[in-house]
Amino acid sequence: MTRRSNIAVWMSAAALAAVACGTSAGQPNSTGPANTTGPGYPYTAPPQAQAVPSQPLRRDQVSVVLATLKEAETHGFRAGEFYPANLEAEVYAADPTFHAQGDALLRTMIIRYARAQHGLRITNWPKNWAMKPAPYDAENDFNLAVQQDRVAQWIDSLPPPFDRYRLLRTALARYKAIVAAGGWPTIDGGPELKPGAAGPRVAALRQRLMVEEPTLNLDTTSDQFDDTLTDAVKYYQRRNGFDTTGKVDTLTLESLNVAAQSRVLQIVANMERWRWEPRLWPASRIEVNIAAAEMTLFEENALSLEMRAAPGRPDDQTPLLTSQIDSIVLNPPWNVPSTIAEKEYYPKEAAHPGYLAAHGFRFIDTPDGGRRLQQKSGAKSALGQIKFDFPNPFAVYLHDTPSHKAFGQDARDVSHGCVRLERPFDLADKLFTGDETWTPDRIQDAVQDGKTQRVQLERPMPVFLMYWTVYPDVKGRMDFRNDIYDWDSQLLGLIAASR
């Protein structure tokens, strides 16, 4: 199965689908350590503190605030969003009335900017974007910074304190420069381009790749598809999540022809999501990048484990959330959500009587006197032999799967909303490190025993389900992924509506 094409259609609205995966109890890729210390807020008033009154700004403080608002566009904000055309004139007006208006406007803009840097522009949150920014009293914080003469330090603390955010900001400047210079050429459609080909399309391919990545050092005067160009195409395919064939097939061509301005908007959307993250991350954590279909484990900020994952389909979207894995279930049965049972399994039984029994399904009683469909644990169970539970309102979790076919594909968004893992027992071994009872051999013995067991973790592991369609690799280069849920488009639309 090849990767589906879902090249960004910016500003469109995505229909949200309910996420349902069920549990047996009935209940950034990231590429390097996140900043888990941050700059801190030593001058921030505690939530219960008395409101700090405003006081006049000194001229040097005014200059710092104006400079910050003027460069807000470098953080992905709209041009002039916090810097209206009359701002500077009113701030420096000789007339006392206009000057007072300018001072009030300046305060309004810097407070609005501070809230925006904390991800608070959006108010109409989709149901399955459960990772939301923390409340933030920007006005009181600003007044305190003025009072303590720490305006510059306060401003420096406003953007997300993560290396990956800073790298996205650098990438934003670079891609904006590409747009300003005219973007990159479009490659005409036609037969698959592969080694040995020649002609105008190959010449356009060379030019296209060099505009985005000058370090490839391609000869843009040549129209030959040689070994050097093959390596460059493979490099592009790795950066964009395609099979590294070195051939320009339909999906690779569609990706190459995405406009540079669309890449700018994609970066802007991902910078916005970083504003929703907790400012201090746990040093040990699991990150799932839904868009890239990858899971990464960090231990003490060091990359410890990574593997492919299979998140929900576009009609069964895996939600954005943060929680903690507190238990692991061995040989888990699957309580099938009623929506999935009615949509998928009851029709199969109607078409092929005996299907449910043949695949290990049965009906069980529920506490409210009803009945629900359950798939027994075992080799055929959709949850495989192990699942990782964490509290959340969507009844989703990480789990094993009896079918590993998807892990060999580029497009792995195939689940009902939960996240399937390529090597779940490797993760279990990591989570039980230091536990003298649940050794790898003990886990395998328990699985072979066939009984369902829930094991509480001595140290719950934070887990972040995130959606990065642009993220830096270990060398700081940008990787792009398809907007499989149209969430970039939806987010950009919500930002535009927040004006």
For each feature predicted by the language model, list its residue ranges.
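Well-ordered beta-sheet/strand-loop patches within structured domains
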Residues: 22-25, 38, 111, 131-138, ...
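Positively charged, low-complexity intrinsically disordered regions
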Residues: 4-5, 28, 363
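Cationic-aromatic interfacial patches
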Residues: 22-135, 139-140
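Small/flexible residues
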Residues: 5-6, 60, 422
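Low-complexity, intrinsically disordered short peptide segments enriched in small/polar/basic residues
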Residues: 4-6, 16, 264, 440
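Bacterial N-terminal signal peptides that target proteins for export
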Residues: 1-11
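Residue-level signal for mature regions of secreted extracellular proteins and peptides
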Residues: 14-15, 411
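C-terminal motif of bacterial Sec signal peptides marking the signal peptidase cleavage site
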Residues: 18-20
